[in-house]
Amino acid sequence: MSVLGVICGLAVAPASTSPSPPAPAADSGCFTIYKLQHEVGAETYVWSRAAGGRTLTTRWAFRYLGSDVRLETTLETTDDGRPLRLRSLGQTSTLTDVDLSVELNAARATVRDRGGTRTEPASGEVFPIHHYPPVALEEALLRFWLARGRPAAVPLAPAGAASFELRGSDTLTLAAGPVVARRYSVSGLLWGRQSMWATSDGRIVAVVNGDAELDRFEAVRGGFESQLATFVRAAVRDGLEELQAIARRTPPVRQGDYAIVGARLIDGTRAPPVDDAVVVVRAGRIAAVGPRGSVQIPKGTAVIDARGETMIPGLWDMHVHFEQVEWPVAQLAAGVTTARDVGNELELAVGLRDAIRSGRALGPRMLLAGLIDGAPGGLGVQLAGTPDEARAMVRRYHDAGCEQIKVYQSVPPPLVSVIAAEAHRLGMTVTGHVPTGMNAFQFVEAGADQINHVGFVLAVMTPPPQPGQPRAPVDLASSEARRAIAFLLEHHTVLDPTLARSEENAHPKDSLLAVYEPGAAKAPPELAEVLNASGSPGDVAARRMAGLARALPIVNALRAAGIPIVAGTDLVVPGHSIARELELEVRGGFTPMQAIQAATIVPARVMALDGESGTVEPGKRADLVLLDGDPLTNISEVRRVHAVVTGGRMFLPAPLWRSVGFAP
């Protein structure tokens, strides 16, 4: 039973061996919805006969992190399955909504959405569907594709095209007997690819993908829930194969031994920039660094002319969730060479980390923080309810090679100290959200080393609000603020404030995100649609944006007091938002150099990897970024990546961006 009381334990119908017809005139079903393999709700659907055709009505309802998500969609078709009209109203995630009508008539499509009403040419082979759609609507699209002889692509209305690639078949072992499901890789319905399983008559069994808020999402037909682990493993395997194919299609433009000559070097150490610098790369490491006249380039070494460019250390993003395989490629294109994943499905996170580490796949070097939450309403499947369960989860993550534990907000407060003690015993550190029932002081006193999101810190910098009243703005001269800063300093607490994520949530919903984050304008249309549906309405947006404006100088004050501030994005626009994080830091009072250090040497030091990364110095990994501009003059120049070097392998960003659907 789902958390909303919908039962999906339906009988499994035998697969038909006949050619794929349209959906039957009368049919119904249910899909259990999961986020990070944790059941959160269900989608139900019914096909009914109407005058001259059939109607699909599908509803999904789930509860995620305290928010309800509901969506209702109707599709009207002719008896032979040709779509006539679509209506979809509700939410595609806790952050995004849809209000769409499409009517197909006489080679025209009339579309009504947030952009108004428009009429466009459309052939009879167009299918009406929005991005991040309900599963039953995808099933109608799959049957449409099968009935038309499996064309290379199906044009969609309002926009785009969908394609299906058969990846293989999986035998699913059920109590009633084995069921063979075809496994497809589907593109065009969301950013990246979706894994889909269907019987031979086009009946969808399961889908696995990133959803409209870029979380890992699974939907499984009633009766097939026991096969969730099979679907998860196969989706990871296919995703990693696609990531490796991207690596084969976008090889490095330089690797091995070479020298980069003529760039202006910002080495990240606080030393003044070096004009006309030379950096010698040998076997993936920095062999020599200095002004041109002081560095001898070994005979026979290839030389790269970087005059007019600026070199900085490879960037770190300390708050990522690589919940689909396209993420690490986008991050690398933006100059991120090290990323900390702070909450993911372990199967995917470990698979990505290992594939990148081996050189089979492209992306930043990954550090992992294993997620632990509590029930009910927790995130993921590692839900601790007892000390023994908590310790076992920490050990599992340690054995998987995780550097940290990520505590989430439903962990019972008494278990935080248990988790921290076991993590510290094993040489791991602890980061996370402050759980419900605790404040930041209690969280740190229980053993947390780091805090995600500035809001948890701001909450202890002001007096508790009166019942029914908003919290007062932070006054840095107040005793509460001074006490909080002294406490964090005493405990060496690290903060990743995630300012870009705060802006995404706060900005006015009637303004495109690209007004604030220009990278959103380069996103593929499937992703741009949900990015531009983000934000807050009216007065809520004004209040939240004002709160963000007040928070920026407070983050700078924390940094100035000596509290380590590390740059982390928490999703938003893949790749681009690390630059937005630095821009917001500078707006709050960081110098450009301080912002660069928050994304280089400070996180390297925090993660005890400053001997390997974080600055451009001999002996360290050759993780470098060449920029067509000077970020010390304008921090936004970090967006102008000319080339990125990871472990000595140099890549141009444009092919990387294109490989995951972005405009360069």
Predicted regions and their residues:
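Acidic, glycine-enriched loop/beta-strand segments at the rims
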Residues: 173, 248-252, 265-278, 291-292, ...
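Contiguous hydrophobic, core-forming segments of folded domains
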Residues: 66-138, 191-195, 200, 205-211, ...
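Active-site neighborhoods of metal-dependent hydrolases
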Residues: 393-411, 457-588, 654, 661-663
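Solvent-exposed helix/loop surface patches that form functional interfaces
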Residues: 24-26, 40, 92-180, 230-237
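Histidine-rich, glycine-flanked metal-binding segment
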Residues: 270-312
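Extracellular/periplasmic ectodomains of large secreted or surface enzymes and adhesion receptors
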Residues: 217-262, 296, 647-664
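Divalent metal-dependent hydrolysis catalytic cores, especially in the metallo-beta-lactamase
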Residues: 328-348, 363-372, 398-411, 429-431, ...
